[in-house]
Amino acid sequence: MVIALFIGWMGLPGSIPATKTNSLDWRVEEDGRLDYLISKPEFNLSEETVDANSSLIAVQFASRGAEIAGLLRIPKFSRTVSDEANDRDGIPGIVLLPGATVTKEREQGLAKRLADLGYATITLDQRNLGVIDVNADLELFLEGSEPIEHIMIHDALSAAEILRSVPEIDPERIVYAGESNGARTAIIACALDERSKGVLAISTCGYGTDAAVAQSGIEDEDTIRFYRSIDPETYLPLIAPRPLAMIKSENDTVIPYPLAERTFALASQPKSLVSVGCRVHGYCQEMDEGIEKGLKGMFS
């Protein structure tokens, strides 16, 4: 349903040759799976400030020709609900990706809640604040250039490498989390980052690309490959055996609950889908128990 809307917006494209769909560190496989070669980016950290139960540090890092801004939040204590014995030196970390139009500052309510549980987070101002233009990205891809949605995934992977370089954080206990479209990026990034321990996806779903393409009659292989490359459902087989924890309101005001159920059904175990009743799109306090349990399963 969702990807069908995208296809409707752009219409059926002409046969534009994909002259270049890979580079030394970026490629898209024939099945639509994106792949990146990631290394730790250059980054700068500001002076830390104390905010409630944690330290807050502004981050700037270079990624694919742009400067990306983030907020690093480190809890004052290292014990987490998943590490009751406190026998590890490092704090587990989360790459936290807001939904479209949401800034890193507005995402700090959830980041503070995660700090309460003992998790460090790095929250990004995503490119275009997470707003996507599928038509423009498709044109870029067919021309052989990187779409913005691909680069956003690169940004998330780079953020994970920054977390791994922070002395207080355990580099082997990193997960991805996101809300709405940020959760789609989080799922894909987790699939590509084999070192990560799982993904927490709030108020999201995949695009159902294969069914939508079949219904629309699109035959251009590169167009189909692009749509599959931005669909988190393409990457679900790469998540297991790491956990996928989905949390969704049955009264979500943007994404119907059955779409989340469809995506969840395509994932392999271990997986969980927690439903709540709040009438919002995105995080609400009713999700706290599911978040705590889902993260505990990733870090235990």
Walk through the language-model features, giving the residues of each.
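Acidic catalytic loop of the alpha/beta-hydrolase fold
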Residues: 250-255
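Primarily recognizes the serine-hydrolase "nucleophile elbow" in alpha/beta-hydrolase
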Residues: 157-221
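Short alpha-helix in the alpha/beta-hydrolase fold that links the catalytic acid
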Residues: 256-264
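Short beta-strand element of the alpha/beta-hydrolase
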Residues: 87-99
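Short beta-strand/loop motif that positions the catalytic acidic residue
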Residues: 239-240, 245-248
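C-terminal catalytic histidine-bearing segment of alpha/beta-hydrolase fold enzymes
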Residues: 227, 265-300
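Cap/lid segment of the alpha/beta-hydrolase catalytic domain
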Residues: 101-154, 208-217
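N-terminal cap/lid segment of alpha/beta-hydrolase-fold proteins
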Residues: 37-88
